[in-house]
């Protein structure tokens, strides 16, 4: 299964990185970092003035699609997203399967003012501290990659550092984990990370099971304004959109069209 392969490789990478820069060393480096993470909730909460909050993704490649963007300038893409009305920016940092890089996070942080999401396969506290040091305001935690206890522990550590987590679910059992852990931002990924099959009805199936007061994010398979309208009516607050924007030459125009429609 592809998710298992990615997690295995991720753990191998963490061992190498921690041998070079320990968790304690990373923690001490925060003394030189006075930046406070942004309040993600205020950026992702839908309002009548901005009902379609978009987390626009900086992503070069994926296991299912291969290279999505040959001419890849992460800083320019992120700046276009902010101008185009993104509420936050998701940055792929996984190097082997998505051709991401942790340095993209630090580079983009210097040029945009909206919240940044470290999107990776996070399974240790070390990666969470890395995210903060490199400029993230919130991180992705994938329920399918963690036990209930692990998810709760990592979410608690994330909040201890002043950040928040987007907890991604793919089915009812994942959702049970997310609720048990106390997740306040729940992402419903229409793509199954084990099989890469899409289920665009998943948001409609899971939203009724989510307690009130949570921010709900729809992920994957979102290409047009009508989907935002329909999902918003069902209870979605924000939308994580990557490939459909990354395939456009003008990301700013593509994002505006997605948010506001053709007119």
From Swiss-Prot:
It comes from Sulfurimonas denitrificans (strain ATCC 33889 / DSM 1251) (Thiomicrospira denitrificans (strain ATCC 33889 / DSM 1251)). Coiled coil: none annotated. SUPFAM superfamilies: Ribulose-phoshate binding barrel. It comes from the Bacteria. Pfam families: IGPS (PF00218). This is Indole-3-glycerol phosphate synthase. Its EC number is 4.1.1.48. InterPro entries: Aldolase_TIM (IPR013785), Indole-3-glycerol_P_synth (IPR045186), Indole-3-glycerol_P_synth_dom (IPR013798), Indole-3-GlycerolPSynthase_CS (IPR001468), RibuloseP-bd_barrel (IPR011060). PANTHER family: INDOLE-3-GLYCEROL-PHOSPHATE SYNTHASE, TRYPTOPHAN BIOSYNTHESIS PROTEIN. GO terms for biological process: L-tryptophan biosynthetic process. Keywords: Amino-acid biosynthesis, Aromatic amino acid biosynthesis, Decarboxylase, Lyase, Tryptophan biosynthesis. It catalyses: 1-(2-carboxyphenylamino)-1-deoxy-D-ribulose 5-phosphate + H(+) = (1S,2R)-1-C-(indol-3-yl)glycerol 3-phosphate + CO2 + H2O. PROSITE patterns: IGPS. GO terms for molecular function: indole-3-glycerol-phosphate synthase activity; phosphoribosylanthranilate isomerase activity. The keyword Membrane does not apply. Belongs to the TrpC family. Pathway: Amino-acid biosynthesis; L-tryptophan biosynthesis; L-tryptophan from chorismate: step 4/5.
């Amino acid at each position: 299964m592809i998710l298992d392969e990615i997690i295995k490789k991720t753990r191998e990478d963490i061992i190498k990185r921690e041998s070079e820069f320990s968790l304690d060393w990373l923690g001490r480096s925060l003394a030189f970092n006075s930046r406070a993470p942004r309040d993600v909730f205020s950026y992702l909460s839908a309002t009548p003035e901005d009902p379609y909050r978009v987390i626009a993704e900086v992503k070069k490649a994926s296991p299912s699609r291969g290279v999505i963007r040959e001419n890849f300038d992460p800083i320019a893409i992120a700046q276009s997203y902010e101008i185009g009305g993104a509420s936050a920016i998701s940055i792929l940092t996984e190097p082997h399967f998505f051709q991401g890089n942790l340095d993209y996070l630090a580079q983009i942080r210097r040029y945009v003012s909206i919240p940044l999401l470290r999107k990776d396969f996070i399974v240790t506290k070390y990666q969470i501290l890395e995210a903060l040091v490199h400029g993230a305001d919130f991180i992705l935690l994938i329920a399918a990659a963690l036990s209930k206890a692990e998810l709760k522990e990592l979410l608690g550590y994330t909040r201890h550092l002043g950040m928040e987590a987007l907890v991604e679910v793919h089915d009812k059992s994942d959702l049970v984990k997310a609720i048990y852990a106390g997740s306040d931002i729940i992402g419903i990924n229409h793509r199954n990370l084990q099989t890469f099959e899409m289920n665009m009805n998943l948001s409609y199936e899971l939203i009724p099971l989510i307690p009130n007061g949570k921010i709900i994010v729809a992920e994957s398979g979102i290409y047009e304004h009508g989907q935002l309208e329909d999902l918003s009516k069902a209870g979605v607050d924000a939308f994580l959109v990557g490939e459909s924007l990354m395939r456009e030459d003008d990301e700013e125009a593509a994002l505006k069209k997605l948010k506001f429609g053709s007119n």
